[in-house]
Amino acid sequence: MATAVQQKIRERGFLDGQFLIAMPSMFDANFARTVIFVCAHSEDGAMGFVLNRPQRLTFPDVLLHLQLLDPDEVIRLPSAAREFQIQAGGPVETGRGFVLHSDDYLSDSSIPVSDDICLTATLDIVKAISRGEGPLKATMLLGYAGWGPGQLENEISSNGWLTCPAREELIFSRDLDEKYDRALALMGISPAMLSSDAGHA
């Protein structure tokens, strides 16, 4: 389902498994105040997922769209499946779904992206979640964020992003509104400190 993306993920780079935290100078509306989990970084570019943008679609909506569920079957879904969170993962290929999840679930198409986080982009995991047999921790993302060769490095050197090691509890937190401030807190930074320092050498 995502061959090119899978190839990128297999090529480990030094930003793999890192958070990108948007600086106030990030004026691109797609990325303002975002936290991004970098899944792949190499000389060919980078890809990752925005972790704090809501998506209007629900998991039952996705199942209906994929014709994996009849409308009269929604009520019979396990509660965890009905409430399973869908997020907007980025502006690239927004019709494609990806599931970031804990490593207790593995299929032939699951790809490790860090020590304890995997990515699966096939229908197998969607079906497993709908049956209540999916991973303990997971979130579905529609679309992803992508950068060409050298693009992300340039944005970081231009103070567009802060970087820090990713934390599993933040990746899977359902409170999207708090993720940005919590990611900054991992670095000992408050939003007030950032805004007051913006524009100063």
From Swiss-Prot:
One of its GO terms (cellular component) is cytosol. Pfam families: DUF179. Belongs to the UPF0301 (AlgH) family. This is UPF0301 protein NGR_c05390. It comes from Sinorhizobium fredii (strain NBRC 101917 / NGR234).
